[in-house]
C-alpha cells in the first residue's frame, strides 16, 4: 500500500470500511496474481503474510518470525526517514536504548536479526531476549511520541491521504483510465474493489507521479 499506514487509513476512509494491508497482500497472492489464478502458496507462507500485523499472534512459526521481522524493519526505517526529514537525530534516541539495540541503522538491524535467530534457536520459541524485546517496545513508544505524532510527520500524512483519495475518486469517475488489464476485473469484483486494488498496488512514487499527471497542469513546476 502506498504511504504505509497513512495509505491504509486513506483507503479505509474512501471505502467506508476498514482496509488492512496484510489482508490486501493475501488477496493479491491468492486472487489477483497470474490473471486471477493466484500463486498457490503454502498455508505457512500465507499466514506469514496475513499475521505480520494485528492483535493476534500467528499460529505458525513462519508467521511469528515475519511479525517480529516486520517490526524490526519498520521501526528502523522510520528512524532513518525521520533523521533524513530533520525530525530526529541519532542522538535523540535515549542513550539506554542505543546501548542495548545499537548506535546506527545498520547496527540495530544486524543486532536484532541476530538476537532473534539466536534466541529462537536456543529456546525453541520465536522471539527476542526479554531485555531486547523490552527495549524494542520502548523504542516504538518513543517513535510514537517523537515521530508518528510529530506535526511535520502528520502534515505529510495529510498530503498522502489527499493524494490517494483524489486518485480513488478520479478512477471511480473515469474507470476507462484504469490500466487495461484491470478493466475485466470490474465485471467480477465491481468498480470500487477494482479501483482499490489498483491504488493499493502502487508505490509511493507511482502514486505521486499519477497524481501529478492527472491533477497538475503541464508546464507548471511544483516545489
Named regions from a protein language model:
Residues 1-14, 22:
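Aspartate-rich (DDxxD/NDxxD/DxxxD) Mg2+/diphosphate-binding motifs
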Residues 19, 23-223:
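Histidine-centered, transition-metal-coordinating active-site segments
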